[in-house]
Amino acid sequence: KGYILKTQANPGYLDIVELNYFNLEKIENLLEECSICINLIGILFEKKKNLFKKIHTDFPDLLSKLSAKKNIEKLIHLSSLGIEESKDSKYAISKLEGENKVKKNFERSVILKPSIVYSVDDNFTTNFMTLLNRLPFMPLYYEGKTKFAPIHVTDLVEIIFNIVEGQSNEKTIECIGPEIISFKEIILKLLKAIDKKRLLIPIPLFVAKM
């Protein structure tokens, strides 16, 4: 995906660097060349060695320590909205711990807490569309009543741009869109988009917590 971005930038404006995100020497060298670091690394599902704790907690801990060591101007860290209430979710726990590590390690950090970020080909929409295409039913945890305020990726980029340009002094920013929508409503919109009908099975709160 990074190489697609390069085709949309002026020649010499964007450099794509491939690296293991726990390669300390390479990260330190990259931080030497920048004044602002933006951490957008995250996963929705664990797979093989890509574990929530490793990606959402350990890496932000490392990056924020190196950012402090290199005395960069600002570290912008993408966390997630509502993770404080999700005490039974490995995803949420790892995100919150990573956020706290960044705050502790680097005082000039800015924490962005977006709701669902959507765009063409985003992971959230693509993953659920794939599931809806393959499965004859869709479980609705917490009965599908969980509320979201999805934000379009261009609006999130504008927030980041304003921070980079020094137009915001907030330390933590909740990033939400104009519409509040339930998880069930999101699934219904996706079903309409792919022209499918599926059995939606509400999973009550006490069952989801088991």
For the regions a language model picked out, list residue spans one by one:
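NAD(P)H-binding glycine-rich loop region in Rossmannoid oxidoreductase-like domains
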Residues: 3-4, 8-62, 66-69, 81-85
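A short helix-to-beta-strand connector/capping loop
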Residues: 9-16, 106-107, 196-198
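A short C-terminal helix-loop "cap" of Rossmann-like NAD(P)-dependent dehydrogenase/epimerase domains
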Residues: 11-14, 129-142, 201
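Conserved Rossmann-fold NAD(P)-dependent oxidoreductase catalytic core, especially the SDR/UDP-sugar
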Residues: 43-44, 55-105, 109-115
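Conserved sequence/active-site signature of Rossmann-fold short-chain dehydrogenase/reductase
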Residues: 83, 117-119, 156
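Flexible, glycine-rich beta-alpha linker
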Residues: 87-90, 110-131, 146-147, 181-182, ...
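Substrate-positioning beta->alpha
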Residues: 123-124, 143-165, 171, 183-185
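Mid/C-terminal beta-alpha module of Rossmann-like enzyme folds, strongest
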Residues: 163-210
